[in-house]
Structures are given as C-alpha cells and as structure tokens.
C-alpha cells in the first residue's frame, strides 16, 4: 500500500512538471509572458529557495536532536573519552562549514537572481579569494589530522601500556573465544596445526607459560586495569569491535594484531548511566565474514578487580588434564545376573 502511494505521488509530480513545461512553451509561442511576469516568477522562485533552505536546516537540527538518543552512551574507556572529543571537534567544524556554505549558496541565488536593470559582473580569477579558501582549510585539516595522529600514537604505543593484562581474542566463523594469561601474565604460543576438538586455539602444550592459560566464551575485564588485547583469526578477516570502549582492530589470519585500552566504567555502573537494567557490553565482528556474520558477537563484562580475580580463580586452565576414571578391579568376581 505504501509503495502504491509513493508511486502515485511521484507520478503526480511528473505530470505537474510536464504541464508546467507545456504552459511555459505555450506562453513563449504566444508572446503572452512579458518581462514583468518573468521578474515575478524569479522573485517567487527565489523566495522558494530561501524557504527550502531554512526548512531543510531546521529539519536537520530536529533530526539530530531527535535521534541523539540512539547514539552510543559515554565512552567506557580512558582513550575513548579523547576519541569522542576529537569526533565532537570534527562535527563542530563540519556543521560550521555546512551551515556557512549552504546559507551563502541559497542567499546568493536569491539576491542575484535575474534583473533586467542589472548586468552580471564577470571575472576570471581572484588570487586573494583563492588563497583564503586554500590556506584556511589546509590549516584546519592539518590541525585535525595532527591531533588524531598524536592520539592514535598514544593508543598504540606499547611503552605507554606496560604491565597491562594480556587477553587473547580469537575469531573464527562465527564466534569469538577469549584466552587469559595466568599468574605469569604470558600467553602460550599457539599454532593452527595444533588445533583439535579439545584444543580449539591450537595452544602449544610444550610451552610452560600456557599451563595456566584460561579459555572463556565471555570477555571479563577488570575496571581501571590496562588491557593488552591480542587479536587472531583462524579463517577469514574479522574485526574485533567493542563500540562502547571505542575499540576496533582487524583480526587477520596468519598474523597477530594488538589493541591497548583501559576500561573505566563497570557494567553495573553503565546500567545506571543508561537507565537500562538489561544493558550489556558486547564485542561484535565489524567485517562481513560470511552468512552468519550478523550473529558473531561476544558478551563483555566489566567488573571490579576483586570480582575479576574471584571469577578467574573459579575458571579451569585450558590445558588441564581431565580426571581419569579409576581402573576396573581385575580381581573382582563377575556378577551373575539373576534369572
């Protein structure tokens, strides 16, 4: 039904446009429209341009305010606050340029509409004007790029994130697995050739640092602790995306990527901030990796350091040998079934 209404409206507009063309052609052929009528038409079209301009700007402002509630909440990581500040600065610059250029464009179209008593002034160049609109954007863009690069260097510089807790995030179609280093805070080596049903990450059992590694299907993180996220993929390119922490890094088969960040807001606190008792942090795949890409996500839980230690203590090491059932007593007499 909605499609039919849309098609009817489009068809009606096309009919009106064609009728206007026919009417204009008839007027020109008959010589009925004089310069006074043309000037009137120009004034009307100019007024319509200004109406369209302000209606569009007001509607845009309304849409920004109306749908702001669907944006991400405050950043839940230390660097995320700085990233948001940089983004806000970009938005301010973009809105300023957008409003300025659109207002000038439509105002000039109205002010300098055709007038029989005025002739257009033509000039082929203006060095001063070209210098202004070249130098100013260059300075603004250079400032934005420089601040962005400096912040990115702070995020990726390993020397500024020493003594961080190592967590491996391992992606495959179509799920994530987390691996935690034990007390030594060192992840064991892994190799895809060692992957089995009982060793899905291919952890090298000969590496002593892996004896206390822990595997989990939920990503638990302690608040206020530097995290070194080690990212790997088994099959295709994935992308570990934690939107609430402003974190994203590709997971590429055959290589290891890393991301350093520090969570600053626990899950419980974010529930209070958002007013949503069911709020959960989540890690998504932000690369289209196959038919079930949309379902590739992992729950992320941020807790106090004491809670994290208690949770980690209750988890079993990934390479812990399962308990072996006691051997049958060979000296026991066989039991004869009752007849």
List each model region and its residues.
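Residues within alpha-helical transmembrane segments of multi-pass membrane proteins, especially transporters
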Residues: 10-14, 92, 96, 100, ...
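Non-transmembrane, membrane-proximal soluble domains of secreted or membrane proteins
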Residues: 34-37, 62-89, 102-339
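Hydrophobic alpha-helical segments
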Residues: 1-93
